[in-house]
Structure formats: structure tokens, C-alpha cells
Amino acid sequence: MFNTGTPDSENTYDAILVGAGIMSSTLAVLLHELEPDLRLLVVEKLSSAGLESSCAKNNAGTGHAANCELNYTPIQEDGHLSTTKAFEINKSFEQSLEFWASLAEKGKLIPKTFLNKLPHISLVFGDEDISLLKKRFSKLSSHAAFAKMEFTMDHGELQDWIPLIMDGRKQSEKIAATRIKRGTDIDFGNLTRSYINQIEGAKSIDINYSTNVENLQQDSEGDWYLSLEGAKKNRIVRSKFVFLGAGGGALSLLQKSRIPEGLLYAGFPVSGKWLICDEEKSTKTHNAKVYGKAAVGAPPMSVPHLDTRWIDKKKSLLFGPFAGFSSNFLKYGSKLDLFRSIKTTNLFSMLQAGLDNIDLGKYLLNQLIQTNEDRIDTLKRFLPQVSPNDWKLSTAGQRVQIIKQTSKGGVLKMGTEVVTSSDGSLAALLGASPGASTAVTIMIEVLNRCWQEKMKSSKWKNKMLELFPSIGTDINSDQEALLAIRKRNDFLLKLI
């Protein structure tokens, strides 16, 4: 604990957002749009915004809409193919597009600085997986959200879709793909910085870089006090609301907050690696995000994909991800992060989750002992004619997988989760994929849980309707509304 003192008005805020990544910056823009006079403080450990998980090379850059990700349509134990998650994620991503479209309409976002239209393709090999892909295509394409999905097994058509991947393949090879042309590649680092650029000139907003949150505590009246350590000065700040959006660093801060809800969580860090190609002969030929199928027994995070990426306006190809291990919770964190996060309240959950996920342990071990030749061999499944010297290994960001204590014990969770205090004064975002693609929906959830009275007010309701014309409409069941909002989004974001 620390001596809070009594911060003056200069150090008192309506909301403090920890981390200047895609999550906190999304929430900051939402709050500023809803009520411009709110005093906001954004605190970032690094020297600029969007340098950790939001940085383009630290994530897949996929606008996750379930167009091509087979793990979003899992096969159930009874053999049934579930589409629930696919429709949920598709709807969430459309809401992100809707928000960006509204900001673009106001002249506050320039789509071409972070957003590129790019086909999303699912690719499989062999009879069994082709049968699975056919089933997925049949179920999804019957709905308006995926009505423009195409399926083919024809080598000639595939040559047109993915020429680099088809180069050197035998005509007899059994291969199939689906394609949705309305896919995207997103530079979330540039988007984050665009958000921050929108708000940093406002008198009501302070942004502190190179500043670390050392501790936080709540007083008897519900106010939060944060101890900040900066490059030039240290200070204590106060707020009635705190959002912990510090990526992998959110867990340790959640634990320091001592809210009971935070005691249910632990985390396990997994680092990522990409093979990157900048050779123009390849980057000119391949123009898609192509997702394969995870190997039997491998976790969803291991789904291999070959992506066209635009990073700082430069076109590259990325293949992966390959997993590694570091005890850091952040790429620029500490090797002690994992060990410091182990508490008496979560140790049993971690041990139980480990025993229940032996396959994940085997997968990570196999990944750790891989050589670069092994990685190139994996790439050859996608690119039979690959030139190994054209591909370089690059370290991506850290993801911290959630381990949550439930009635069934410690459970490893693969998605993202919002944790809030019972009084709504603190919220934290934990987890990984689909993450950034659904940041807008996640932050609206934070607003609904932590700013309930404001969200019920006519002022905020009207403002939300202005930002999200489809709000209150289930676009998964209302085809007319879906098509209308897509037409608007495509026009304003230049995705036509």
C-alpha cells in the first residue's frame, strides 16, 4: 500500500486508462465522443502509442470476421459444426467497421492509413478436411453475412485465387478453398496512433508516455489512487474509474488492485514468431490472407496462415505463427512477470489447467525445439516452391492466455475476457485473439458494465446512435439492416 495524500484537481480525472494500445485508445475515443469534457488520463509505459501487442509486426493484422478462420466453426463432440462463434465475431467486426466509418465521415480517421481490402481464404488438403470445408461453406453461405463466400476445388480457379501457393503443385493433389473478397488487413499500430492523435490536443485529455503504474488502491469512498513513476517525475493521481488495458501487463495490475474478481485469474504467456518475406517477386504475386487448419491436437493459436500485410505502407508476406516461450507478460516486459503473477489464490488453477492441457504443452515443446529448417518445411505445405533465403524469422508479440478458476477448477481460455469490479469502478481486459478486431464491441461492453447510468441517459444514447446507426438491431437476424450497414461501411471506408 502507499500514502495517497490528497491529489489536487490537476491530478484528478474522470477516467484513467492504463496502456496506450488499441483497447485503451478505443475506449478513450469512445468516451471523448460521448462526453468531450470528461477528464481522461492515458498512461503508457513505452515512449509512444501502439508499440506493444498493437504494433503491426506483433499481431496477425487480420480483421477477424470469421471469413476464413476454421477454429471459429469448431466440430462438436456429436459431429455438429458450430457456427455460433463465427456469427458473433462477424457481427463484432462489423461494429468495428461501423465505428471507423463514423469517424471517417467526421474526418477524424483516414481509412487508407490503417485499412486495406484483402480477400480472406480458407485452404485445406485431403478428403477429410475438404469434406469439413464443404460443410462449413454450406452452413455459412446460406446466411446473408457469408452469402458471398465462394468454394472451389478446381486447380485452375485456385491458380487465379492463390497463384503463389499453387505454383509447383501436382494436378492430382486434393486441395480446396473458400474465399470472401470483402476481407481486410489492418495495421492496428497505425489505427491506435490515429486514435491518440485525435484526442491528444484536447484540453480535457492528458497522455503520459514513459510512465509506469507502480501501484493502485481504492479508498473507502470508492475512488482509485494510482502511483505513477515517470521519466521526469513521480506523482499520485485519482479517478473514479480505471481501465487496465495494458495487454499482458493488465493481469499484474488487476492483482495489485485486490478486487475479489481478480483473484479468479492467472495467466500463461506464449510468444510468437513469423517468417517474413519482403521480396517483390513474391509480394506482388500473393494477395490474400490464407488460413489453413491446425494440426490434430494443436491449439487454435497454432492455425497456420500466409498473409499479405501492409506494415508502415510497405507490402510484405508473413507466415506463421510459430510459438515460443518467454516468461515475460509483455514483449518489453520482465522475465519475472510469470513468477510474480503466481499467488496462493491461483496456483492450484494453474496446475490443474496444465494437467488438462497436455496437448498444448507438447505443442509448445515441439515449437521450442524447431529449427529454421523445420519452419521452412512447414511453410512448404503452403509454398512448395519456396526460396528459403527470401524468408527471415521475426519475433512477434506476447499473448497471455487466461486461466480462470471456475466451479470445474482451473480452465484455460483462448479468447478475451472483461473483468470488472462489483461497483463498476475498475475494468480490466485479459486474453488474446480475436482481440483488436473486436475492440469496439469489447469497449462498449465496458461502458455498459461500468458507466450504466450514463449509457442510459438520452445524451449518450443519441450519441451512440450517431456513432453506431445499427445499434439495437441484431444484424445477424435482420438481413436488410445488415446489408444497409455494410453498404454504408464500405462506402465510407472505401472498401468497395
From Swiss-Prot:
It comes from the Bacteria. It catalyses: (S)-malate + a quinone = a quinol + oxaloacetate. Its EC number is 1.1.5.4. SUPFAM superfamilies: FAD/NAD(P)-binding domain. It is an enzyme of class 1 (oxidoreductase). Pfam families: Mqo (PF06039). One of its GO terms (biological process) is tricarboxylic acid cycle. One of its GO terms (molecular function) is L-malate dehydrogenase (quinone) activity. Its cofactor is FAD. Transmembrane segments: none annotated. Keywords: FAD, Flavoprotein, Oxidoreductase, Tricarboxylic acid cycle. InterPro entries: FAD/NAD-bd_sf, MQO. Pathway: Carbohydrate metabolism; tricarboxylic acid cycle; oxaloacetate from (S)-malate (quinone route): step 1/1. HAMAP family: MQO (MF_00212). Belongs to the MQO family. NCBIfam families: mal_quin_oxido, PRK05257.2-1, PRK05257.2-3, PRK05257.3-2, PRK13339.1. This is Probable malate:quinone oxidoreductase. The gene is mqo.
